[in-house]
Amino acid sequence: MKIMRIIRDYQFVKSSDKGASVAVGNFDGVHLGHQHVIDIARLWGIKNKSPLGVLTFEPHPRSYFSPHASSFRLMSSDAKATRLNKLNVEKLYELNFNKTLSSLTPFDFADQVISKGLGLRHLVVGEDFCFGKGRSGTVKEDRKSVV
């Protein structure tokens, strides 16, 4: 099994870590639904000869916005990374969910983080995925912004 690379800063990404086919989400628990999204990204990666990646956030956005709420997480960041490595994910983009990231509009997230920063080739998301400030970006918006 190859060792998965973990990338934590979208502003300083090596060219060798760009161009991945990526499943995007929090993947807490890495359950069968998550694995299905990852498998779709894997198939796109095979088709396009690009590495398989997962883009996730730490801390979980819910924890960031409600730091005093009771813990709801099924697994730690380290446990998630271990599980993703066992699924042969080649690159884990684990971004620090902070004020800067949480303030980006959907367009700016797609432009600054996905396109210019991480240089991702293809994104796969679950149908309930939202992104950008106030969760205002949807999958439909994502397609318009990134393509």
Regions found by a protein language model. Name each.
Residues 1-147:
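Nucleotidyltransferase catalytic core that binds NTPs
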